[in-house]
């Protein structure tokens, strides 16, 4: 028994082969990948482990790496003016690539072929035999293209990995990304039936068993062609291409498609159209058109926001693109509120919440419960469209697909890495641009060569960068080779802020929104613009008093003094529980506060860099958005954006943030310290929970007792843990049931209303922090 105070014995040396809790290093790395790096849902882990158990059952495949093959085929038009030229590319990527790599539009997705599109005369176009030929040709082509992988699905193939090592690999068919029309073709079923379950086409939302290869083959044994067509929706004389490959079932491999099933399908093609039909049935054509014009006006009057597409004519345009539907989702609920029943608003809310939940980068079991709750509420509130006579029944395949998302997410993980929007953007680089560079005569061969060269260039760049061969400039490399370069630390001839080659920018409407290719940083950071606007060009103030006059804010000198008092206190602590952190210094006489009325540098914008992996972002999930505060934007009107301000609270989401509007960004030097600042006016949060109809928090402008807006000066950059700008916020007026005056435009949207919604639908990051 050691005496009290005796130091403990040193720990026994640990064996380098002691992987306690795990059998070996491979098991530890697998668990780390599942639960930390990739954060797979439990169902997906079990599914993958089941596949490994199947592979491990063959002695020849033990120890092999399983590589799921993800496919996507989608027709695209390269030119309408020259004869409606269409191509049918087939894309491939592997399931071992992380989701962030897929969504950052790097080179994980490649074109592996172009499918045939048979032509015939109008006389035979609708002939059943020709249609059957086209369908079976589609499956036969897929089988032929993938035939080279078939041997590696049973016996290991030797492949060289990125780390330079050779590994034994077993391939398998994974998710197939397809819209509904192509899912019908893939699953060999009749249109208006579900490709995943056996629910009857007249009542798709009824509970039913899932389709599978074994179930279909059993039906083939007992049913006739006509019975299978009418009672089960099966096209019995077609053979799915997956039947030629081991461990493959076409009904299990079809991935969810957020873009076509939810955004363009359930939202735009269904609910938006139903709103117009409801208004016509309820008010008649003339009054309905008047209401629709007001809805369009409300949409046009929404304030600008980085990445938010502007609808200059409302939503009344002929050709809808996927980005148009995404943009309309962000502003549509406040636009219709007051013109439609509460049940309609709640229907849209449930659908939008479903869409944003399944679009999240990380989905947990709690998220799956929220997804199921959103589906239940959607089914409950959409009944208003049936009881009002807008639609007789809801047996719609794309709406019905919402019921399968939770199951498919458990199989394949977060759907945002498998959405067809990934290949929609790839069409530009892989099909349309190569076609434009071709001679237009027998262009397909030329396009294939172009894609081959692009892939080789991308691979060469990765190799050269990994060996440090692209540092410096071409001239510096030559001088260094000749021994004529004294200083090797020369600038690079490539802009580090430029996106990698072949990467889509996906900027909407030219707004200042960009992805960041730097490493992951969980703490948000805001910085002012790099340059000060020219005094002669913008006539911005250059002193405190001049800035006070420009902003019509006589209290600015006093605000700066109180700001300096807080910053120069030796015991400066910020009370995170205060409604406004800034009011602490108002108990101090102004005479006790430092005075500064000297020079200032005024900036038109600032940029916020934060972690937002659910939105368009870089490999590390980082995103940069610009916050504007300028007297003249796009040579039209002034623009002063709203922001979320970090209050220093430990509370997650909007309860730990304040909402404010930036009047100006500026900086000044006091006692040798530069203070980057923002003048903001505040909003008060109304109520202790979001609005029950829209699901959005409500705020109103804050005023002093003398009815003057509450202005404060805060840090514009991350200096302390509180009282700093986090990221941009977007507010939408609460229009109620009043028609919007014609003189209200987006430029006065933040000045003309008494209350606003904090728009949680403006992007996925805001949805996560403002729900």
Where are these regions (language model features)?
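N-terminal regions that are enriched for targeting/export leaders
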Residues: 1-53
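Surface-exposed beta-strand-to-loop junctions
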Residues: 22-30, 113-128, 308-312, 330, ...
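A structural/positional concept
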Residues: 42-89, 93-97
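Charged (Asp/Glu and Lys/Arg) segments that form or flank catalytic channels of large polymer-
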Residues: 55-71, 121-142, 146-334
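Terminal interaction-prone segments of large eukaryotic proteins
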Residues: 55-59, 245, 264-771
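Core residues of folded domains in eukaryotic genome-function proteins
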Residues: 65-71, 86-90, 108-111, 190, ...
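Acidic, metal-ligating active-site segments
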Residues: 78-119, 676
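Short helix/loop capping segments that flank catalytic or ligand/cofactor-binding pockets
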Residues: 79-82, 90, 100-103, 202-207, ...
